[in-house]
Amino acid sequence: MSLQAPKGTKDLLPTESYKWQYLENKFRNIAADFGCREIRTPVFEYTELFQRGVGETTDVVQKEMYTFEDKAGRSITLKPEGTSPAVRAFVEGRLFNETQPTKMYYFTPVMRYENVQKGRLRQHHQFGIEIFGAKDASVDAEVISIPVGIYKELGVEGVELNINSIGCPKCRKTYNEALKKYLSKNYDKLCSTCKTRFDKNPLRILDCKVDTCKEIVKDAPIILDYICGECKEHFESLKNYLDVLNINYKIDPFIVRGLDYYSKTVFEFITDDITICAGGRYDYLIEEIGGPSMPAVGFGMGMERLLLTLQEKAIEIPEEAYVDLYLGNMGDKAKLEVLKLAKELRDRHIKCEIDHMGKSVKAQMKYANRIGAKYSMVLGEEELNTGKATIKKMEDGQQIEVDIKDMDTLIKVFK
């Protein structure tokens, strides 16, 4: 029996990697437009980071984390999300001592033990942005505008932005009391997980995926009716900023997000009933992880779900030729010259492929076509004697005679 990749994982083969590279370059450029710099964090962290940050009562911590003990008996978890590690790095690196705000972006694999289905894998990849140190709602609007810009640049239409405010610990306490009073009428119908959440963190019940619980919370009190004056003012400011930026949105009072660290603003981008990007404000997470009291806001965007969306909307990602010139050869002497010529061209960043398998010229040209080479050139005894060779443009068959010793003229063909 041949070995296979674990369930819920997927290999990224060379025939697909160009799509990822295209998107990653797009994201990097857009992140740079907003003054964000890249951060890279370990693929695993101490489990306590996610217990404290994400929350003990969340589905992520209770059901979905890949957790194990290392050889020293320490509890380690493969990271299930990108924000907590970024915050941990921000605190550990004492970046809070620098002039704020601090703006970061990242690409990271995240691992969750979930039911494998369309657009949902056990290892998927996130593009994320985190901004630390700014509390005004204008930065929330700026963060939201980044995915808006990404979808616009990629030509993705039909994406809906939903926003909500889940308040702060002060006003959430009042809401939790009202929510518990409402839920108590149907306590016996709650799933076992939500029964444990009832006293510890009733807000999490709104995020339950079990059908009976989803039905119960349909008529639950709306958190926007309970937020304090400060949180209400922040939410009104956010809406005003989004209006100024001409960003359309809907208010969804039942968005709470599946992670405990969120406060005030939460948002989701949805298309075809699938959430393809989500985020919000987390003004208390930095302090929870051991740093000073400092506001923050960010989002995570699933790469696999974005690629699925592009595919379903028939949006093609352009594939650039990854070989400028295929250098064919006829005979051992020509092969030596081809090796030397390829080195000189590569030293000047011309992407070259050569034959290492002793193929016939016909087979070499067939291979050049398969790899999408822009040009081809074959060296044989005649070309070595005259110092002249013909470069063929693979797209239309156009031919150009060149002096193979005149490197400057040769390179101009590819520029």
From Swiss-Prot:
Annotated catalysed reactions: tRNA(His) + L-histidine + ATP = L-histidyl-tRNA(His) + AMP + diphosphate + H(+)
Enzyme class: ligase
Pfam name, any one: tRNA-synt_His
Any one biological process term the GO annotation gives: histidyl-tRNA aminoacylation
Highest taxon in the source lineage: Bacteria
Keywords (A to Z) from UniProt: Aminoacyl-tRNA synthetase, ATP-binding, Cytoplasm, Ligase, Nucleotide-binding, Protein biosynthesis
Subunit structure, interactors included: Homodimer.
Protein name per UniProt: Histidine--tRNA ligase
Source species: Clostridium botulinum (strain Kyoto / Type A2)
UniProt lineage: Bacteria, Bacillati, Bacillota, Clostridia, Eubacteriales
Gene it is expressed from: hisS
